């Protein structure tokens, strides 16, 4: 890391080492090393799962946080094409890039599908030329549903070391991208440490740092300050940027009757600027210049929903959908400049209004990937908003949303800590995987089937290893059955040895196999035997107690 980017409090250590029951493995595909988490099952089989943790779970890797991760993509081809060197431009030219081949191997699909979806604008590959450390991923509805984890300091909480650890911790448990939303001290330095050590794409909201440069006064913001901030972040390697260019002056009055007004930080900043100057947003008026900047680095637009609803009462209102129509216009402009685009969505939406959001986004924004914050399906559960939002997230992902921004238990209450980050990631991995199952994504059900088989065969350690959170699964089992023999017992503390339905089912199968019967025949034979026994006893319901 360049000395100019160093600070007096370096990051000394982060969480490393394999996840329980697994090892880091690399599959050689078409000259590329594709990372997977290989689970070694007790029956001698192995099971590979998609892995976002980078070298941090590789016990053979040497982690040097000062130097950063190996520059994986430095040696990859960057073909010459007319216009910008972006994944969108290459895809439109019919070129399958190394990033596309890498992604295809990770997803278990053909490289041509990756290229075609990127070319059509239905998928994006956030991969800044200046972030060679990342392992490429794709965001699009024909691929695995991705999740993002927000990290970042505030004016009152957290350090650089804590934020880097949050990044490593989030990717360990499955975060596909990270957003650094720092608003406190050392924003540039924090971002530099995260980028140089992040194996996944990193997103930002540049208006936050721009606001810091003018001491927190929205009215003092200028296009020049914002432009320079975007260039600064693009030079560092930021892969996608949230830009609230759809918050127009004429839309601000539409929020006046809302229960919760404008809840987006970026949206409120731009609304305040528009009202202070009574002029159209500089993000909107300078959008084409912004496109030219992002195209140089292949930074992906994440067009922000600055007027998203902050309560279920405000869901699907005119302010929200007016902004969405403008985002559709901006999507066309960005793509004409060869810049990849995804669209951000709500927010707080009751279940019966969720699918309408996806339908309109696809209609108005040319099916650009949808990236939503939840949405929260109800407003009544502070401290449990990871659950209220996961309900909405599963529904909206099944309907076609490509990436879900996680919500932690601290939502609306405070800055999430390390434990909150893990809870948010695991909760959203559940929602994303449930949607993958419902959409029939290739290979999605294989992990469910493997875990169900292990459960039926009482392979407890395999159940833990195949789960999204092996540590917690094992800890819960250990609370009541910590002894080593319990890890092969044919029951758990829920039902005990006599009432375990799976043990009884297994006994039926064993009886059937021993007597050359089908399961149904075995049950019928057992019932017949009991019937004969009842008749032999004289048909008595109550028999004498045998001491």
Swiss-Prot record:
Catalytic activity: 5-amino-1-(5-phospho-beta-D-ribosyl)imidazole + S-adenosyl-L-methionine = 4-amino-2-methyl-5-(phosphooxymethyl)pyrimidine + CO + 5'-deoxyadenosine + formate + L-methionine + 3 H(+)
Protein EC: 4.1.99.17
Cofactor, how bound (note): Binds 1 [4Fe-4S] cluster per subunit. The cluster is coordinated with 3 cysteines and an exchangeable S-adenosyl-L-methionine.
UniProt-annotated binding residues for [4Fe-4S] cluster: 492, 495, 500
UniProt name for this protein: Phosphomethylpyrimidine synthase
One of the protein's GO biological processes: thiamine diphosphate biosynthetic process
Molecular-function GO term, any one: zinc ion binding
Ligand binding (substrate): 150, 179, 208, 244, 264-266, 305-308, 344, 371
Keyword annotations of the record: 4Fe-4S, Iron, Iron-sulfur, Lyase, Metal-binding, S-adenosyl-L-methionine, Thiamine biosynthesis, Zinc
UniProt KW Metal-binding keyword: yes
Binding sites annotated in the UniProt record for Zn(2+): 348, 412
């Amino acid at each position: 890391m360049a000395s100019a980017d160093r600070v007096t409090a370096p990051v000394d250590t982060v969480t490393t080492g394999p996840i329980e029951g697994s090892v880091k493995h690399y599959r050689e595909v078409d000259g590329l090393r594709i990372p997977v988490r290989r689970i070694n099952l007790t029956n001698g089989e192995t099971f590979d799962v998609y892995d976002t943790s980078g070298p941090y779970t590789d016990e053979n890797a040497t982690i040097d946080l000062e130097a950063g991760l190996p520059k994986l993509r430095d040696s990859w081809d960057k073909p010459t094409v007319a216009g910008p060197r972006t994944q969108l431009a290459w895809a439109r030219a019919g070129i399958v890039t190394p990033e596309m081949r890498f992604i295809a191997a990770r997803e278990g699909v053909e490289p041509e599908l990756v290229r075609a979806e990127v070319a059509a604008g239905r998928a994006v590959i956030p991969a800044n030329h200046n972030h060679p450390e990342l392992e490429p991923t794709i965001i699009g509805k024909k691929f695995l549903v991705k999740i993002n984890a927000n990290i970042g300091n505030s004016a009152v909480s957290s350090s650089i070391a804590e934020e880097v650890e949050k990044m490593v911790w989030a990717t360990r448990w499955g975060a596909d991208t990270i957003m650094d939303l720092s608003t406190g001290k050392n924003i540039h330095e924090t971002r530099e440490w995260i980028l140089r050590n992040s194996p996944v794409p990193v997103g930002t909201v540049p208006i936050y740092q721009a606001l810091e440069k003018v001491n927190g006064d929205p009215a003092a913001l200028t296009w020049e300050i914002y432009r320079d901030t975007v260039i600064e972040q693009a030079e560092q390697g930021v892969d996608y940027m949230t830009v609230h260019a759809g918050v127009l002056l004429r839309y601000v009055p539409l929020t006046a009757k809302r229960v919760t007004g404008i809840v987006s930080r970026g949206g409120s900043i731009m609304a305040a600027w528009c009202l202070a100057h009574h002029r159209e947003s500089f993000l909107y008026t300078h959008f084409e210049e912004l496109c030219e900047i992002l195209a140089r680095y292949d930074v992906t637009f994440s067009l922000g929903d600055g007027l998203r609803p902050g309560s279920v009462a405000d869901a699907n209102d005119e302010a929200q959908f007016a902004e969405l129509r403008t985002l559709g216009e901006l999507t066309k402009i960005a793509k004409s400049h060869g810049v990849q685009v995804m669209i951000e969505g709500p927010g707080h939406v009751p279940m019966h209004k969720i699918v309408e959001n996806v339908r309109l986004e696809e209609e108005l924004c040319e099916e650009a990937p949808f990236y939503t914050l939840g949405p929260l399906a109800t407003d009544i559960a502070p401290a449990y908003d990871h659950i209220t939002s996961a309900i909405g997230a599963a529904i909206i992902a099944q309907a076609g949303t490509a990436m879900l921004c996680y919500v932690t238990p601290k939502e609306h209450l405070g800055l999430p800590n390390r434990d909150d980050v893990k809870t948010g990631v695991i909760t959203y991995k559940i929602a994303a995987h449930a949607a993958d199952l419902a959409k029939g994504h290739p290979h999605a059900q294989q992990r469910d089937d493997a875990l169900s088989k292990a459960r039926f065969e009482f392979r407890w350690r395999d159940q833990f290893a195949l789960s999204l959170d092996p540590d917690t699964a094992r800890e819960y089992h250990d609370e009541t059955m910590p002894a080593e023999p319990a890890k092969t017992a044919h029951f758990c503390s829920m039902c005990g040895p006599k009432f375990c339905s799976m043990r009884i089912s297994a006994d039926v199968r064993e009886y059937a196999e021993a007597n050359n019967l089908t399961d149904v025949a075995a049950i019928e034979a057992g019932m017949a035997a009991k019937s004969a026994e009842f008749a032999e006893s004289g048909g008595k319901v109550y028999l004498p107690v045998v001491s």
